[in-house]
Design a protein with these regions (language model features):
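Sec-dependent N-terminal signal peptides
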Residues: 1-4
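N-terminal leader/linker segments that initiate helical-solenoid repeat arrays
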Residues: 7-49, 294
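Terminal, low-structured helical/coil segments at or just beyond the last alpha-helical repeat
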Residues: 20-23, 257-296
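Structural signature of tandem alpha-helical TPR/SEL1-like repeats
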Residues: 23-30, 58-67, 94-106, 130-142, ...
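Short helix-capping/linker turns of helical repeat alpha-solenoids
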Residues: 37-40, 53-55, 60, 73-76, ...
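Short N-proximal segments of mature Sec-exported proteins
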Residues: 46, 222-232, 238, 242-253
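Hydrophobic face of amphipathic alpha-helices that form TPR/SEL1-like repeat modules
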Residues: 46-53, 57, 82-89, 93, ...
């Protein structure tokens, strides 16, 4: 009886003192680890997060992985997801794509959108498992039907290209629109180009520019490149070499692979002063970390 009373008092003491930012952090962590060792899943998750983020303890990815794995082995879906992602990236453990696929698949059985989307990508690109486009499509679709915007984009892409499913532009547009309406920048950018060209939708320069500008505002490299093309060709806006060079330069700096060639092409018809103006605007965008660059 005396031991039980002491344990109850000790738990209350360390938790209360921890909330006040007192000196009992070590005791508190020790108490949590004892509780986690007894099989308490919530505490295992908490410790995994603490060691991952350095909350009250030094960051330790190995200990983080260990505690997430304990909870994952008991069927906890959030823990299974974290274990899968750490295995996929080699964080706190050796990189193991095949093991990551197994854990994503376990989490996906519960219908978890994130897990389903990751399983879809691994099937589509042969990461940790063999390529199986039909399984990829089915996995994406399950997540897309639960309003996961990334999965909606992948479903749209596969319908558009006929990957793992028959080509169906009409349904592809529906899924692109759903994904874009939820803020997915890949969907916004691609759908924007469709509206500019009238691919699968009535041609609408206004709608196309609206979508591409929205994606560019969030720092999307391909959207920057498309804005360069818009100004180079004068699509719905006056043709402007400075703005064309600007957006090609921003796209290049943000990682777009072919934008540099377009930037160099735009420079051929520009004066040195115009190029310097465009470069100054591009640098201003870079200082904003490529976000909210539409208005300087």
């Amino acid at each position: 009886m005396l031991t039980l009373v002491f344990l109850t008092w000790h738990a209350a003491y360390v938790v209360a003192d921890d909330k006040q930012g007192g000196l009992s952090t070590i005791s508190h962590v020790g108490f949590l680890e004892e509780k986690a060792k007894s099989g308490d899943i919530k505490t295992q998750l908490r410790l995994g997060t603490m060691y991952r983020d350095g909350q009250g303890v030094p960051r330790n990815s190995q200990k983080s992985f260990y505690w997430f794995l304990q909870a994952a082995n008991k069927g906890n879906v959030p823990a299974q997801l974290r274990v899968a992602k750490m295995l996929e990236r080699g964080v706190g453990t050796n990189e193991n794509k095949a093991a990551a696929f197994i854990w994503f698949s376990k989490a996906a059985k519960s219908g978890n959108n994130d897990a389903l989307t990751n399983v879809g990508k691994m099937h589509q690109f042969g990461i940790g498992t063999q390529i199986d486009l039909q399984k990829a499509f089915r996995s994406y679709l399950r997540a897309a039907e639960q309003n996961q915007s990334e999965a909606q984009f992948h479903v749209a892409q596969m319908l558009y290209k006929g990957l793992g499913i028959n080509k169906d532009m009409g349904n592809a547009i529906i899924w692109f629109e759903k994904s874009a309406n939820q803020g997915n920048v890949d969907a916004k950018n691609l759908l924007g180009t469709f509206y500019l060209k009238g691919i699968g939708v009535p041609k609408s320069t206004d709608r196309g520019l609206e979508l591409i500008i929205s994606a560019a505002t969030e720092g999307h490299p391909a959207a920057f490149h498309n804005l360069g093309l818009v100004y180079q060709l004068g699509l719905g806006v006056p043709r402007n070499d400075i703005y064309a060079y600007l957006w090609f330069a921003v796209a290049t700096k943000s990682g777009h692979q072919s934008a540099k060639r377009f930037r160099e092409g735009a420079a051929l018809s520009m004066t040195p002063d115009a190029i310097n103006t465009a470069r100054a605007l591009a640098s201003a965008c870079e200082r904003k970390n490529f976000k909210m660059c539409i208005s300087f």
